[in-house]
């Protein structure tokens, strides 16, 4: 096996892992966003416990759905990953300091979003050259 072939295999593997994570994150965040907007107890309870009212619940649901949509778009998936990582960073802090419960689910989603950001980092240069 030559070096270019090994590099191509790694790139294809990285690409496949990124797509799998993106599909998982899009599915999870779309379901969470719909659940939060529809006030399904499993999804909306922790948002309601923050105590900021319905406007905050709507904002969280919209943030989750936007993130799910953007991470699904091939050319700008890295922006969706950064968006979701930021949201999950705040979710971890909220679970630790306001709700005082386990942030494990939010932390796992944060790590998955960061991993997609790392795997799709080449999109930053493409976006910069295209829009700046």
Locations of the language-model features?
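Solvent-exposed, flexible loop/coil residues
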Residues: 41, 56, 60, 108, ...
